[in-house]
Amino acid sequence: DETIKKYVAIVGLLTHECGHVLYTDFYHSNEVYDSWLGYNFSWGRFVDVSLQEKAEEAKKALNTYPNIRSVFIYDMKSMVNVMEDIFIENMLNLYYSGIYTAGLSLLNNALYECSKTTQEELYEKVVEGNLSITAAVIINLQIKFKLGKEVRNSQNLSKEEEQVKVLVEDFIDENRNIIEKLCWESDGSKRWMLN
């Protein structure tokens, strides 16, 4: 019985990866990633003038200090991958059945039955429409700082990065009620548009 479950889970993993090939727009996604790494980083559309001004201030800081920007973008890519996973699995469950969807279900149960991380809770809120993906990344970044984790490449925060940390925390604290109302566009055809 356990052997059969393992084989079915492997089918689920292969189905998931095939879903990326079937439903992912790689050309478009690469353009988005490139824009994040450049000076055209998209914060999405904000619903309040003061929040927009704060976002511009944070955007400027992220462009000024490349180290912190790379950490932010690394998290953003990670979260978008999760959003994409959700999208492709919804499509697979919609159009395929039998062992394929059974494999997906078994695989997901095996992956997530042990624990739920803070990131996973953030992802759930994004999927439910209660949190924008940009806000989720900012909050995730804030959590990293509060836990005292080091920046990539095992470097401690510089004075400039400490300033960005404070800026991110202020951004969240001052606009939490608005951030929580922002909604990521979950429609498949617009899944890469963060506004």
Placement of each model-derived feature along the sequence:
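Short, functionally important secondary-structure microenvironments
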Residues: 1-195
